């Protein structure tokens, strides 16, 4: 079987609420850490989410 080129990652809110999204990313095309503006329902605003590893 072929080895998967995608890693599971956790995008955690920088607002300090503990809210997170999970997604996958291609580790060859995007080796740097992701940072995306997404909606945080706990503060009801768009905030930056940064990539962390899933434990």
From Swiss-Prot:
Q: One biological process GO term for this chain?
A: translation
Pfam family membership, one: Ribosomal_L33
Q: Where is the composition biased (Basic and acidic residues)?
A: 1-11
Q: Which PROSITE patterns match?
A: RIBOSOMAL_L33 (PS00582)
| Chain intervals for the UniProt region annotation (Disordered) | 1-28
**What terms describe the molecular function in GO for this protein?**
structural constituent of ribosome
> Which cysteines are disulphide-bonded?
none
The UniProt entry, under InterPro entries, shows: Ribosomal_bL33 (IPR001705), Ribosomal_bL33_CS (IPR018264), Ribosomal_bL33_sf (IPR038584), Ribosomal_zn-bd (IPR011332)
Compositional bias annotation for Polar residues:
14-24
**Claim: Ribonucleoprotein is one of the keywords in the record:** yes
Keywords of the record: Ribonucleoprotein, Ribosomal protein
GO cellular component: a single term: cytosolic large ribosomal subunit
NCBIfam families noted in UniProt: PRK00595.1, rpmG_bact
Entry similarity comment: Belongs to the bacterial ribosomal protein bL33 family.
Q: What is the protein's given name?
A: Large ribosomal subunit protein bL33
According to its UniProt entry, this protein's organism is Janthinobacterium sp. (strain Marseille)
In the UniProt record, the gene name given for this protein reads: rpmG
């Amino acid at each position: 079987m072929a080895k998967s080129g995608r890693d599971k990652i956790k995008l955690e809110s920088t607002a300090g609420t503990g809210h997170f999204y999970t997604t996958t990313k291609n580790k060859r095309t995007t080796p740097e850490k992701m940072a995306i503006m997404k909606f945080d329902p706990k503060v009801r605003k768009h905030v930056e989410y940064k990539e962390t590893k899933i434990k």
